[in-house]
């Protein structure tokens, strides 16, 4: 009987948590996923004044061939209002009472692109930067008034933190959790030692044309 009671409580808490999550759309008409559809992101609010923002990772497209090999789900907006809330670090911050924002990765460009390319004659949007700018703009007042503000990302999302450091640094005392290399001088020295497999081409993609806003923010 006690077990059933505890299970009911757990289910009630889970339902309440999921009910608070909202699927939001970007407002800028250029803040789109690679397939050209308006990007979406997830906001799960609590009664706290603390905010946790998670940049999703998942590789990158360094050429038309590598883009075509990526899953279709990585090129379009999510329609799931609970998307990304299952990630362990996201769940952890939710348990701590933080408001949570999940930025899905649908542009294959390390959350930093602002250009288009033709792939098999079709326009493909690499507008990750535009998506991040739009989301930050929509949540700007929340971030400015946050008691604690934490940004995190994994893999491509972690590198995306570095590419968007100029946006992050605008807020008071932001904290950053990066689980892999971001693009600072020290990590670049290490990456340039990787000369086997796809790393030569990947590094060329990463470092060939660094955005001006990436310089000097850490």
Located regions from the model:
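A domain-start/cap signature at the N-terminus of enzymes
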Residues: 19-50
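Surface cap/lid and interfacial helix-loop subdomains adjacent to catalytic sites
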Residues: 116-117, 123-150, 165-218
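Hydrophobic h-region of N-terminal signal peptides that target proteins for export
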Residues: 11-19
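Glycine-rich nucleophile elbow surrounding the catalytic serine of serine-hydrolase chemistry
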Residues: 154-165
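Flexible loop/turn segments at secondary-structure boundaries
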Residues: 60-62, 109-110, 158-160, 183-186
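Active-site machinery of serine-nucleophile hydrolases
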Residues: 44-138
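Short glycine-rich or small-residue beta-strand-to-loop segments that form or flank ligand, phosphate
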Residues: 103, 149-154
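Sec-dependent signal peptide recognition
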Residues: 2-10
């Amino acid at each position: 009987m006690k077990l059933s009671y505890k299970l009911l409580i757990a289910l009630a808490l889970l339902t309440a948590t999921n009910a608070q999550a909202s699927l939001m759309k970007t407002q800028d008409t250029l803040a789109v996923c690679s397939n050209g559809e308006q990007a979406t992101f997830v906001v799960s609010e609590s009664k706290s004044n603390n905010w946790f923002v998670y940049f999703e990772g998942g590789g990158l497209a360094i050429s038309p061939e590598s883009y075509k090999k990526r899953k279709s789900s990585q090129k379009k907006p999510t329609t799931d209002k609970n998307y990304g809330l299952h990630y362990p670090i996201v769940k952890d911050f939710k348990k701590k009472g933080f408001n949570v924002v999940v930025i899905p990765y649908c542009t294959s460009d390390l959350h930093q692109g602002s250009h288009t390319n033709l792939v098999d004659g079709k326009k493909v949007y690499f507008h990750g930067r535009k998506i991040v700018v739009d989301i930050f703009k929509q949540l700007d007042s929340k971030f400015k008034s946050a008691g604690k503000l934490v940004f995190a990302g994994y893999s491509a999302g972690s590198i995306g933190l570095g590419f968007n450091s100029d946006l992050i640094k605008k807020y008071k005392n932001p904290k950053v959790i990066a689980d892999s290399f971001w693009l600072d001088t020290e990590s670049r020295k290490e990456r340039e030692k990787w000369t086997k497999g796809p790393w030569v081409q990947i590094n060329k993609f990463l470092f060939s044309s660094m955005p001006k806003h990436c310089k000097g923010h850490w």
